[in-house]
Amino acid sequence: MGGASKKPISTMEKRLKKEAEKQQKAEEKKKGPSKTGKEIISRAVTIDEETKKKVLDEIKKESIITPYALATKSGISISVARKILKELENQNVVKLYSKNRRLEIYIAAS
């Protein structure tokens, strides 16, 4: 009754090569660019006049407006719709009616 047989030398060499490659890839990932100085990406959104007109028309048509509704009707992302609505709230075009952690409901300012 013998135990398990030893693995061949070629199998051991292949395993060692794979481990060495994994270590190299891990080191390359660690040496990636740091997020300091000029490497930080600006997330500012600029809105063109055509999009603003679309948004204002949608707001006039609807009694209430949410970021999701605005995004689907205007063809923009929800995050951009949120930013637009916040900007319009600061300009007193819309008024925040209700808010919880997931949803913001706006109405047209009268």
Curated annotation (Swiss-Prot):
Region of interest: Disordered: 1-37
Keyword annotations of the record: Ribonucleoprotein, Ribosomal protein
Pfam family membership, one: Ribosomal_S25
Recorded superkingdom: Archaea
Cellular component aspect of the GO annotation: cytosolic small ribosomal subunit
Biased composition (Basic and acidic residues): 12-37
InterPro entries (UniProt xref): Ribosomal_eS25, WH_DNA-bd_sf
GO molecular function, one term: structural constituent of ribosome
UniProt similarity note: Belongs to the eukaryotic ribosomal protein eS25 family.
Protein name per UniProt: Small ribosomal subunit protein eS25
Species the sequence originates in: Saccharolobus solfataricus (strain ATCC 35092 / DSM 1617 / JCM 11322 / P2) (Sulfolobus solfataricus)
